[in-house]
Design a protein with these regions (language model features):
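Eukaryotic scaffold repeat domains enriched in small/polar residues
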Residues: 2-306
Length: 306
């Protein structure tokens, strides 16, 4: 009986020892995989360059949008400014509070503040003020198409869809608490086909919704590799371009292009001295020129291909 017990114990010791060897061997492999991913990120060159940078508008630059005709609107701490395609200043207007996001469609410019949506004409006249929509809110993004205006509220983790009269047509995320928003970055884009793209930053992905709030698809995973989204919450900002998407991250402050399936195409800018925790807001009307508003120095950066 004692011999059997000794035999069993001996076998168990051998199994434990073999298991330790396997685990100990696997750790360096996992570490090498992580190192390989970091190395892969460092080895991919930027395909674009900064062609222009200049101090735009006033203090605390936060947002940018560009029209098909080339007009550039920027916004920040209680202002919206408009520039022509040659970056000549056309006008600057004061806003009731700091601007957090910008969009344009047709003859209208839409500026989000913490609690409201400002409707402006191309000359900067404020025609309407929509909201507040909640007792406490933090609107971080606004986007418009022919029929609708959508905005994202990072405080309440909800997306509002309005008609062009400012009436609420749909609220997404109010009941199911679907959006995970760890920080005040919550971006959305509404396209001309009424597809609504939303950055669910805590999930590290871009989700596509119908105008009725039905989730249709999504892409994105956390990680350091070029095709992944890094940091606690990403993408912080993004815009739709003919090629697909141009996205901005924080943690590793990098701008990249993904195709329409969400697959990595190229880096716009990944080797820079931008503050890691301060991402750049993005806009592009044609996918040829990309505009980026950087709150770190209140400059507008213009990217073109190398």
């Amino acid at each position: 009986m004692n011999r059997k017990l000794v035999t069993v114990l001996s076998v168990l010791v051998i199994i434990v020892f073999i298991g330790y060897i396997i685990i100990d061997t696997a750790k360096p492999l996992e570490s090498s995989k992580d190192d390989a991913k970091k190395s892969e990120t460092n080895e991919v060159p930027d395909a674009w360059k900064i062609s222009t940078e200049f101090k735009a508008g006033g203090d605390s630059l936060k947002a940018v949008t560009v029209t098909l005709s080339g007009k550039i609107y920027v916004g920040g701490n209680a202002f919206v400014s408009c520039y022509d395609k040659g970056l000549g200043l056309l006008w600057t207007v004061k806003t009731p509070s700091a601007v957090t996001g910008l969009s344009n469609y047709g003859d209208s410019v839409f500026a989000s503040t913490r609690a409201q949506i400002l409707v402006m004409n191309p000359d900067g006249k404020i025609l309407n003020e929509w909201g507040p929509f909640e007792d406490k809110s933090l609107i971080t993004s606004v986007s418009a198409n022919r029929r609708f205006v959508a905005f994202a509220d990072a405080e309440n983790k909800t997306v509002y869809i309005l008609d062009k009269g400012g009436e609420v047509k749909k609220i997404i995320g109010q009941n199911d608490k679907h959006f995970i928003i760890p920080s005040p970055y919550f971006e959305l884009v509404l396209d001309n086909m009424n597809n609504l793209y939303v950055a669910n930053t805590g999930m590290h992905r871009i989700e596509t919704y119908s105008i009725d709030g039905v989730l249709k698809s999504f892409f994105g995973e956390p990680g350091l590799a070029p095709e992944n989204f890094c940091g606690c919450c990403a993408p912080a900002h993004f815009a739709i371009i003919p090629q697909g998407f141009v996205t901005a991250e924080k943690g590793i402050n990098r701008i990249k292009i993904l195709n329409k399936k969400g697959e990595f195409v190229e880096f716009v800018n990944s080797k820079n001295s931008f503050i890691k925790s301060v991402p750049l807001d993005l806009a592009s009307a044609d996918g040829v020129t990309i505009y980026a508003a950087y709150p770190g120095d209140s400059k507008l950066y213009v990217f073109t291909r190398k």
